[in-house]
Structure formats: C-alpha cells, structure tokens
Amino acid sequence: MSIILGIDPGSRVTGYGVIRQVGRQLTYLGSGCIRTKVDDLPSRLKLIYAGVTEIITQFQPDYFAIEQVFMAKNADSALKLGQARGVAIVAAVNQDLPVFEYAARQVKQTVVGIGSAEKSQVQHMVRTLLKLPANPQADAADALAIAITHCHVSQNAMQMSDSRLNLARGRLR
C-alpha cells in the first residue's frame, strides 16, 4: 500500500490530490487547491510551502509527484511557476519524501490516452478512474492525474524489474 500526493504547481493556485494505491486499485483520499490571494510573490510562496506542509502532515504520503516545468511564452510566468514548484518540492524534501517529476504531456497520455488532451478530458478521466461523484476542480484534477501517473509509472517499472529478474533466473537454471 502506498499513499501518493500529486501537486499541480502554480503561483496563484496550486492543486493537490491524494490517492492510495493497493496493487492496481486506486482510492481517492482527498484533493483541493491552495489559493494565494496576496499580491507579493514571497508571501504567495510562503503560503504554498505552508499549505503543502500541512497536506503532507494530514495525509502522510509515501511519495510526492509534481508536474515538471514547461516552456512558457512568458518568461516571468515561467520563473514564478518554477519558484512555486521549488517551495513545494522543499516542503516534500523537508519531510523526507521521495520526489518524482512528470511532464504534462506524459500525465495526459497516461490518464486520457492522448498527450494533447484538454483539461475537461483530464477531469472526466480522473472522475472515472477514481469513481468520484463529480468532476474535481481543474487544478485538483491535474494533481490527481499526476498522482495516478506516478502509480502507473511505478507499477510498470516494478513489472519490468520482475520480468528482468525472471529472465535472469531462467538463464541461471
């Protein structure tokens, strides 16, 4: 059993999603958004750090998964996004959580089956995969999708490792 915290970073709205994985079974534990309504960036970063730390304390995840920075058209926005990611990662590392990063395209490909999927498609598939009564908020859905991606990637890595081990055992006999 593993608990995974997914984070969709943003300097104004940071989405989070928490799921439990038991084998191939995924269970929704919680999700939401950390909203920073103050204007100055240092105060927003402090709120993101405090919010992520509080979520980690509440859910006690085993793994921390976050979206990678993408190339934005606006350099200022990309820098702010990078700083928001940074404080979220520091919050995880301060709690000794292993950090995993996934590209947005990989997350969409894993959850929807199309790397260029729309936000509404991600919301719908997250709702379906986690058997939720309604679509989660967009940023929370993205965070849950990141957590789901981590589950699938880690599950596939374990299967590949088992296959290699079995292949090696077959050669030794």
From Swiss-Prot:
InterPro entries linked to this entry: RNaseH-like_sf, RNaseH_sf, X-over_junc_endoDNase_Mg_BS, X-over_junc_endoDNase_RuvC
Principal place of residence: cytoplasm
Cofactor-binding details, from the entry: Binds 2 Mg(2+) ion per subunit.
Entry binding sites for Mg(2+) 2: 67
GO annotation, biological process: DNA recombination; DNA repair
Listed Pfam families: RuvC (PF02075)
Keywords: Cytoplasm, DNA damage, DNA recombination, DNA repair, DNA-binding, Endonuclease, Hydrolase, Magnesium, Metal-binding, Nuclease
Catalytic activity: Endonucleolytic cleavage at a junction such as a reciprocal single-stranded crossover between two homologous DNA duplexes (Holliday junction)
Enzyme Commission (EC) number: 3.1.21.10
Cofactor: Mg(2+)
GO MF term set: crossover junction DNA endonuclease activity; DNA binding; magnesium ion binding
Subcellular location: Cytoplasm
Binding site for Mg(2+) 1: 8, 139
Lineage top rank: taxon: Bacteria
SUPFAM superfamilies xref list: Ribonuclease H-like
UniProt xrefs under PROSITE patterns: RUVC (PS01321)
One GO cellular component, as annotated: Holliday junction resolvase complex
Signal peptide start-end: none
Catalytic residues in the record: 8, 67, 139
UniProt xrefs under NCBIfam families: PRK00039.2-1 (NF000711), ruvC (TIGR00228)
Summary of subunit composition and partner proteins: Homodimer which binds Holliday junction (HJ) DNA. The HJ becomes 2-fold symmetrical on binding to RuvC with unstacked arms; it has a different conformation from HJ DNA in complex with RuvA. In the full resolvosome a probable DNA-RuvA(4)-RuvB(12)-RuvC(2) complex forms which resolves the HJ.
Free-text function comment from the UniProt entry: The RuvA-RuvB-RuvC complex processes Holliday junction (HJ) DNA during genetic recombination and DNA repair. Endonuclease that resolves HJ intermediates. Cleaves cruciform DNA by making single-stranded nicks across the HJ at symmetrical positions within the homologous arms, yielding a 5'-phosphate and a 3'-hydroxyl group; requires a central core of homology in the junction. The consensus cleavage sequence is 5'-(A/T)TT(C/G)-3'. Cleavage occurs on the 3'-side of the TT dinucleotide at the point of strand exchange.
Assigned protein family: Belongs to the RuvC family.
UniProt protein name: Crossover junction endodeoxyribonuclease RuvC
